[in-house]
Amino acid sequence: MSKATKKVRDKWRAKEWYDVYAPAYFGEKKVASIPCSDPVKVIGRVVETTLYDITNDFSHQSQKLYFLAANVKGTRADTILKGHEYSADYLRSLVRRGSTRIDAIFNVTSKDQYVTRASVVAFTRDRVNANQEHLIRSIMRKIIEEKAGTLAYGQLCHEMVLGLFGSEIYNLAKKVSPLRHVGVRKSKLLIIPEGVMAKPGETSVQPKAVEA
């Protein structure tokens, strides 16, 4: 055995496997196992999976989920949702000739102070004019921005990922023009409140010191 091969094998022997779990608002399901030589290095790692892997619902295969490792205890890594998105193939499948695609992007703040960027998309049955597009975007904004502030981050994730926002927008916007699909096609977590994620050099959130 060459020295280089032995060195690589020794590096792998020094690594431990960490089980990565979805957050409670996605059932705390195990979504991955990752090797790492130091639990501190697990913090900040991002794991990609699909909503199908969480729900076992075949219709959810087109939704990608990204989980961010926030805390490690033993060999268990707990996460928060960093974001989600439609697969490129699914998004392409929604396009139809003679229809209009309407996009809007909103930065929203949850009740517990997470800031998320939500990218909303609507596909109409027929081509619409500029005024109709404006009205549909206004409905998107009203529902997303008003409701986001009343929800904790976990609830907000459910609304975005499971299509609940899309259903609410659809039911109002269809009065402007017939629609084929509405949904939050992508989300991205921008700001995480203090005390949620382990600080650099630590593996878990430390309890606050009690003042004398």
Describe the residue ranges of each PLM region.
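Short acidic, glycine/tyrosine-flanked loop/strand segments centered on an H-E-D-like triad
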Residues: T109-Y153, G201
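General structural signal for secondary-structure boundaries
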Residues: Y86-L91, N129, A152, L190-P193, ...
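Short, highly charged C-terminal tails/helix-capping segments
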Residues: H158-L162, S167-Y170, V182-A198
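Hydrophobic-cavity lipid-handling domains and compact docking modules
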Residues: S2-V128
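Intrinsically disordered, compositionally biased charged tails
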Residues: M1-K15, G195-A212
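Short intrinsically disordered coil segments
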Residues: L81-Y86, H134-S138, K199-S204
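Signal for well-folded cores of large energy- and translation-related assemblies
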Residues: T109, R141-A152, V161-G166, Y170-P178
